[in-house]
Regions:
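Acidic, Ser/Thr/Pro-rich beta/coil linker or hinge segments at domain junctions
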Residues: 211-257
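Short, compositionally biased
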Residues: 107-122
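Short, ordered loop/turn segments at secondary-structure junctions
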Residues: 30-33, 62-64, 100-101, 145-147, ...
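General beta-strand structural signal in soluble alpha/beta enzymes
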Residues: 57-61, 76, 96-98, 141-145, ...
Length: 257
């Protein structure tokens, strides 16, 4: 429905993945399938625009212009000196959400696009915060907020780290006009959840605020296997990955190539 945006997102989500791990993107490769070359022009334009914006070159890939329909796959290479993992959140940590609210929803999707029309230098500087925080030893674990939204991404972090998380819905900051329920499932173009030691919360939040990015502590990390949502005096169970795995991480030891 929006091939330019699909191409842009192919780059954007990959550079966000690298930032979420405390790294800096180096290069991108892509695979494009289309019925004909002209069918892929708008898609490729979106990729080129994002590549130029984030200054991450597309160095190669594969094209098939004899395919049944338009499809895209993108991979990214990056480097990090201090990793942010999904596996190191611990009981006692605080969950922080950092999101760029300077945007709007793209068409009828749940994609909150804060990169459209934004200065490229600002977007690159915002992403640079993640490796800087990691190299400063201020972030223990984290993930970029994906298509599963804030709650689903927090669930993935909890399961990866074998911890419980309770999210305070009243603490979640939202863009002007955004309702809570759709915001919880939204996929922001810049959004991260981070596990941070209590003593480091103020320092981490201030780094984002210095760049006019919304950031706040939204939850607590404890022992267990659940994700709870609370508002006021009410707390409800959202998911228990011990009884119903979300990612189904049966083994952290690779069993095949």
């Amino acid at each position: 429905d929006d091939p330019w945006f699909a191409g842009w997102c192919g780059v954007m989500v990959n550079v966000s993945d690298i930032a979420a791990m405390g790294g800096r993107p180096v290069a991108i490769v892509d695979q494009v399938w289309a019925p004909a070359a002209e069918c892929a022009e708008v898609l490729m334009s979106g990729m080129r625009d994002a590549s130029e914006c984030y200054q991450v070159p597309i160095v190669g890939g594969h094209t098939n212009y004899d395919a049944f329909e338009l499809n895209l796959a993108v991979s990214v290479f990056g480097r990090a000196t201090a990793l942010i993992t999904s596996f190191d959140a611990e009981p006692g940590d605080v969950l922080i959400a950092a999101v760029d609210h300077r945007g709007s929803y793209r068409n009828s999707f749940d994609n909150f696009f804060a990169a459209g029309g934004a200065p490229a230098e600002r977007l690159r500087g915002d992403l640079e915060l993640l490796p800087e925080l990691s190299e400063a030893g201020l972030v223990k674990a984290g993930k970029d907020i994906s298509q599963s939204g804030i709650v689903g991404t927090a669930l993935m972090l909890a399961e990866c780290s074998s911890v419980s998380i309770t999210i305070d819905l009243d603490a979640i900051e939202r863009p002007d006009g955004a309702l809570l329920e759709p915001w919880l499932r939204s996929f922001p173009s810049f959004g991260f959840i981070l596990a941070v030691k209590p003593d480091d919360v103020a320092a981490v939040v201030s780094r984002f605020h210095d760049r006019n990015l919304a950031a706040s502590a939204i939850g607590d990390i404890t022992e267990g296997s659940t994700l709870h949502l609370k508002s006021g005096d009410e707390t409800v169970l959202f998911w228990d990955y011990a009884s119903q795995p979300y990612l189904n991480l049966q083994s952290r030891v690779p069993t095949h190539a």
